[in-house]
Amino acid sequence: MIDSATVAAILASVLDGKPLEPEAATVLLKARDRSLRQQIQAAANQLRSRQVGDRVSYVINRNLNFTNICEQHCNFCAFRRDADQDGAFWLDASILLEKGAAAVAAGATEFCLQGGLNPAAKRNGRSLDFYVELTASLKQAFPQIHLHAFSPQEIQFIAREDGLSFREVLMALRSAGVGSLPGTAAEVLDDSVRRILCPEKLDSATWKTIIQTAHQVGLPTTSTLLSGHLETPSQQAQHLEQLRQLQQAAIAGETPARITEFILLPFVGELAPAPLRKRVKRDQPDLSDALLVMAVARLYLGDWIANHQPSWVKLGLAGATQALDWGCNDLGGTLMEEHITSMAGAQGGTAQTVEQLEAAIAAAGRQPYQRDTLYRPVAVEAVHAG
C-alpha cells in the first residue's frame, strides 16, 4: 500500500531539485488512489511552470507516411501491409510533392516523414539511394521546410540492407536535407517486453546507439514511450531512466544535437492484431493512467528534456488538453493527415487546425504560441508572408 506521506516525501525531494530515481518513480507510477494522483499532478504542474513557464506551443506540420508496406509484423500495428495485400500503398514523389505544397500553403514549417520497412524501396539496388532521393526531392521543392524524418528503426533497416554503418546512413540523410529524427520505435526500452510486442524490431541497445549517433552527427531527436499495454510501472520508470541517461550523455559530451522533447504514446488496440489486444483487454487508452505517466515523466525528465507533449491523436484533443495540467507544455502538431494510429482505431482524429489548437490551449488558461520543430518561436507574420 502506497501512503500519502511516502508520495509527499518523494515529491518534495524532486521539487527541491533532487533527481527522481527509478525506484521512487515506480512508487509514483503505482499510485491508484485519486488523492495520491492529485498530489503527483500538482507537483508536475508546479515543476512544468518552473521549468518552461505557462505558455503552450504547437507546430504547423504535415505527416507524410509514404508507404505502409513493411517486412515486420509488430503485434500492436494495424498500419502495416504486405505488398500484395488490400490496403497497401506506396506513394510516389509527385503525390508527396502535391501534399507538401498544400501543407506549405497552409503555413506548415515541418514535414514528418516516416514509412514502413519496404525491401523494394531501392534506387540503383540501394535502400539509402531511395531515402536520399526522397529526402532531397522534398528539400529541393521546399527548402524552408524542416524535415523531421525516419525513425531509428528505418535507419537500422537502411544500414542492414546496404551494409553501412549507422553514422554513414545518418550523414547521408543529413546531407540530403533531414533536419531531425523522430524518436519512435522506442516503444518500451526493455527487451523482455519487446520480444512480445515487436520481436522483429531493433533491440533497446541498438535504438539508443542510433539516437546517440544522430546527436553526434548533429541531428536532434525526439523521445517517446509507448504505454498502457504489457509494461509494468518499473519498466516505465527504467525507460525514463534510459532516456535521461541519453540526454545526460549528450550534454556531458557537448554533442551538437540533443533530445528536443518527450512524447507519451498510449497504446490504441481497437484494430490492432488480436493476440495483443486480447492480452491488454482494452481498446482505447486509459486517460487517467496516461496522465499519471506524463506527470511522472515531467518529474523524471524535466531538468534534462524540458518539452513534453501528449498525443491528441491517441487521447483526443480534450484528453491532450488535460495533459497540460499534468506536466505537458506542448500540444503537438496540426498533422493534416494521420494513418498509423487512426488505422489502429484511435478516436482522436487525424488533423487539427491552428484555431482548434489555440482554442484548446486558451481554454486551459494558457497562452498559445507557434513553434518550429526545435521549439523556437515562429514569427507568424513571416510564415504567412512566405
UniProtKB/Swiss-Prot annotation:
Cofactor(s) this protein cannot do without: [4Fe-4S] cluster
Catalytic activity: 5-amino-6-(D-ribitylamino)uracil + L-tyrosine + S-adenosyl-L-methionine = 5-amino-5-(4-hydroxybenzyl)-6-(D-ribitylimino)-5,6-dihydrouracil + 2-iminoacetate + 5'-deoxyadenosine + L-methionine + H(+)
Binding note for cofactor: Binds 1 [4Fe-4S] cluster. The cluster is coordinated with 3 cysteines and an exchangeable S-adenosyl-L-methionine.
Pathway: Cofactor biosynthesis; coenzyme F0 biosynthesis
Enzyme Commission numbers on file: 2.5.1.147
Binding positions for [4Fe-4S] cluster per the UniProt entry: C70, C74, C77
Domain of life: Bacteria
Top-tier EC class: transferase
GO molecular function, one term: iron ion binding
SUPFAM superfamilies hit by this protein: Radical SAM enzymes (SSF102114)
Alphabetic keyword roster: 4Fe-4S, Iron, Iron-sulfur, Metal-binding, S-adenosyl-L-methionine, Transferase
InterPro entries documented for this protein: Aldolase_TIM, CofH/MnqC-like_C, CofH_family, F420, FO_synthase_su2, rSAM
Gene3D superfamilies the record matches: Aldolase class I
Keyword Transport: no
Statement: the UniProt record of this protein carries the keyword Iron: yes
Chain segments annotated as coiled-coil in the UniProt record: none
All residue ranges annotated as the Radical SAM core domain in the record: 56-303
Assembly information from the UniProt record: Consists of two subunits, CofG and CofH.
Family: Belongs to the radical SAM superfamily. CofH family.
Function: Catalyzes the radical-mediated synthesis of 5-amino-5-(4-hydroxybenzyl)-6-(D-ribitylimino)-5,6-dihydrouracil from 5-amino-6-(D-ribitylamino)uracil and L-tyrosine.
Name of the protein: 5-amino-6-(D-ribitylamino)uracil--L-tyrosine 4-hydroxyphenyl transferase
Organism the protein comes from: Synechococcus elongatus (strain ATCC 33912 / PCC 7942 / FACHB-805)
